[in-house]
Amino acid sequence: MDEFHRCGKEDSFWQQCFLYPLFFQEDLYAISHDHYLDVSSSSRPMEHLSSNDQLSFLTVKRLIGQIRQQNHSIVLFVNCDPNPLADRKKSFYSESVLEALTLVLEVPFSIWSKSSVEGMNECKSFRSIHSIFPFLEDKFPHSNSILDARIPYSIHPEILVRTFRRWIRDAPSLHPLRSVLYDYRNSPENLQRSIIVVPRVNTRFFLFLLNYYVCECESILFSRLKRSSHSRSLSHGSFPQRTHFHRKIKHIIIFSRRNSLKSIWSLKDPKIHYVRYGERPIIAIKGADLLVKKCRYYLLIFRQFYFHLWSEPYRVCSHQLSKNCSSSPGYFLRVRMNPLLVRTKTLDELFIPVLITNEMDPIVPIVPIIGLLATEKFCDISGRPISKLSWTSLTDDDILDRFDQIWRNLFHYYSGSFDRDGLYRIKYILLLSCAKTLACKHKSTIRVVRKELGPELFKKSFSKEREFDSLPFSSKAAARSQRERIWHSDIPQINPLANSWQKIQDLKIENLFDQ
């Protein structure tokens, strides 16, 4: 496999036309066999399989032939198996074939995605998640509207297979993929549905499908815009799911899909900025309201024509940047534009022009966060702290660690805000909720708990906060922290509160469009 991957561009034609013979390589199934045993909950699937470390290659060959003739009783996924003890051996070999299928498809996909990235000489930037906040401060003040264009979460299996045919010419290699997708679609839990692409089950196969699906959406979208553009300065590209990036697009002219000679709408030097985290892209636009509506309409039409699916209107929503909250990444950050007067003068002091510009002034959305904490039973709707009853069965250390993690993530994210009063109010709510939870567990009072624990409450968070405020940026670090924004980029994972807040906002948007 390494040699096959190392060939790269030299044997790209051979890689596209002769993938199917790889399914009958014994080394491939040895790799998938070892990987399956590593991720399996048990060290050995069955006793009769433990006598031999290698797979039965004849059994694998028979299974490949049976996949296309299987009925719904043969389940390819362990977590969907209604009777895992009876069909464990069959499920084990099915998982091995699924792992092998993923390995075969990952090789040409990685080569294709890498070549597409290397071919973009005009790509303006390529950044990680830690550049989200500098991106907001650098780009958002020059925009007045944003589009929250969520990637569609489902697609028909046949449409997904046809997208693979665009860059894989070996049709027989896609037959196992088609069979796996249809088998998963026809499972009892997904009956009469399209295959769910979002990796709700954390398997390598579904992560690969998500990476490919997102890459395909973005590559087709940007390549379509480039072909329709009169300028060659258009930046476009496609990257895997683990990569976070943003683009700057200039001089876009979009034409009709059916008649390329007829222009739908034309843009003269627009400013469009694109950033994506997970499945939630954000497009910042500087222009009139008509421009924003046309961009939103184009995204809906693009998904309908290229992926043959009806995208709900609420999945592409637009709003003014200065009046609403924006999500990035997983949290909601409210932005306020403040005009600044910048005076400049020449050396000869001939004139002193006055420039009016905007700056991003992020503030803590205290009301939405309190509403989210009330939904998660940390406080009531008015912000009064209450005990978290569902955590009373945990140990004291686990309770302290959970509250500490919530506060640490919130503090690190909103540490760049000028307004700290709302942030400290959130700390007060979490502090008393933690004390009430411990008091409810030990059937005591808050005063007794605070007297016994003392500085143990949020000990890690307080130490982090002191360390953050005393960073040696200058001799006047304490004074500067009150005037300037310092983003503390230490977000190892998205807080569960952010995911819950995201779901609440999605439901509100869906209900708004239903009305």
Curated annotation (Swiss-Prot):
| InterPro entries reported in the protein's UniProt record | Domain_X (IPR024937), Maturase_MatK (IPR002866), Maturase_MatK_N (IPR024942)
Q: Which GO terms describe its cellular component?
A: chloroplast
**GO biological process, alphabetically ordered:** mRNA processing; RNA splicing; tRNA processing
Q: Which GO terms describe its molecular function?
A: RNA binding
Which residues are in coiled coils?
A: none
Where in or outside the cell is it found? Plastid, Chloroplast
Alphabetically list the UniProt keywords: Chloroplast, mRNA processing, Plastid, RNA-binding, tRNA processing
Matching entries from Pfam families are given as: Intron_maturas2, MatK_N
Indicate whether RNA-binding appears among the record's keywords.
Answer: yes
Q: What is its main location?
A: plastid
Quick one: signal sequence residues? none
**TM helices/strands, residue ranges:** none
Q: Which PANTHER family match?
A: MATURASE K
Could you say which protein family the record assigns here? Belongs to the intron maturase 2 family. MatK subfamily.
Outline what the protein does: Usually encoded in the trnK tRNA gene intron. Probably assists in splicing its own and other chloroplast group II introns.
* UniProt protein name: Maturase K
